[in-house]
Amino acid sequence: MESLAALYKNHIVTLQERTRDVLARFKLDALLIHSGELFNVFLDDHPYPFKVNPQFKAWVPVTQVPNCWLLVDGVNKPKLWFYLPVDYWHNVEPLPTSFWTEEVEVVALPKADGIGSQLPAARGNIGYIGPVPERALQLDIAASNINPKGVIDYLHYYRAYKTDYELACMREAQKMAVSGHRAAEEAFRSGMSEFDINLAYLTATGHRDTDVPYSNIVALNEHAAVLHYTKLDHQAPSEMRSFLLDAGAEYNGYAADLTRTWSAKSDNDYAHLVKDVNDEQLALIATMKAGVSYVDYHIQFHQRIAKLLRKHQIITDMSEEAMVENDLTGPFMPHGIGHPLGLQVHDVAGFMQDDSGTHLAAPSKYPYLRCTRVLQPRMVLTIEPGIYFIESLLAPWCEGPFSKHFNWQKIEALKPFGGIRIEDNVVIHENGVENMTRDLKLA
């Protein structure tokens, strides 16, 4: 296997090619990419946790340092001004020397406002990409060249196609997340609270709450019916019934995003439903291939949901086809089958059909689907089906002609378990699909 340094070298070659193309298309000389700045809480002197500009960390694995700048023109070696103040109040990261620094010119920037004296005098034809437009104006960058939509659309579109370096980083992120999931399951089995399970997860992955790529969803019992539950109860429930964990990790700026659901007991209706959702998720992944729209896989899983609702007698006296046609599967799986994954958890350009940013919206029947692209090699996506028992979504079905098909007694019995979600991260290849999550033996 090639070293990370060799993979990174080729990664930079790819980014340089994309940069040359986008600069030529939009008649720019270079791109100035800003890592970002710290922003203080309103009426306070404490900053919010720093989150780096994803377009910056696409080039360099510098994720925790604000006030850095990267100048790229697609021809010359990328130049990084690395913020290196004299500061005895805060930790100061040293000038980096790592596997990637041979491919980038690294220069110390001692003052946050010192970049102006470092840049070329003629800046009218430089594009700025970053979160602080007023900083770009202070640097005399033309307003029309600040986060230009066409440039960002182009860069976002090609971010869907991961380089070998990016795939290597994502596989490392998987390893960290899998370790966390194993530790969290053990904590659940030992009767810990959501708060303490989360601590076990963070310890196993080596993350802080501010370092994980998204807020961990640690949901016991009926909390699993809240799709993005992030409360973290300090008190363990008197009865453990179910545990849904949606939690990831980050490596060199690249995310993992995994979900598992466990039943406290191994032989009840809920446990059997968990097993069946898991089996159907794996069966769907086995069918995935390049050249097929992601939307098709979402629709196919609604057909699989219908099969499970019928098998478990949650919906009765109705064909699977009629369930899908009349959207009786909708309240049980109200979200999409997944989303693109990469530098961001919900990675960009899921709706883009070309590098000009042509948008194809999700089908009106499934408005929360986050991707409508045709799958191609090097794309990385999540596959995360679920079945939930959500009061607000089921209540409208209590009346009307379809109510008689719902087994309300069974549904009431399952509500205390909340729901089920199983999520793997997959890579599309020329001749198949790689399941990064299952390759690490996470059941």
UniProtKB/Swiss-Prot annotation:
Keyword Protease attributed: yes
Residues bound to Mn(2+) 2: 246, 257, 423
Residues the record lists as binding Mn(2+) 1: 257, 339, 384, 423
Alphabetical UniProt keywords: Dipeptidase, Hydrolase, Manganese, Metal-binding, Metalloprotease, Protease
GO biological process terms on file: proteolysis
Co-factor binding details: Binds 2 manganese ions per subunit.
GO MF entries: aminopeptidase activity; metal ion binding; metalloexopeptidase activity; phosphoric triester hydrolase activity; proline dipeptidase activity
Cofactor(s) in the UniProt record: Mn(2+)
Assigned EC number: 3.4.13.9
Gene3D superfamilies for the chain: Creatinase/methionine aminopeptidase superfamily, Creatinase/prolidase N-terminal domain
Function: Splits dipeptides with a prolyl residue in the C-terminal position.
Similarity remark: Belongs to the peptidase M24B family. Bacterial-type prolidase subfamily.
Protein name, UniProt field: Xaa-Pro dipeptidase
Species the sequence originates in: Salmonella paratyphi B (strain ATCC BAA-1250 / SPB7)
Lineage: Bacteria, Pseudomonadati, Pseudomonadota, Gammaproteobacteria, Enterobacterales
Name of the coding gene: pepQ
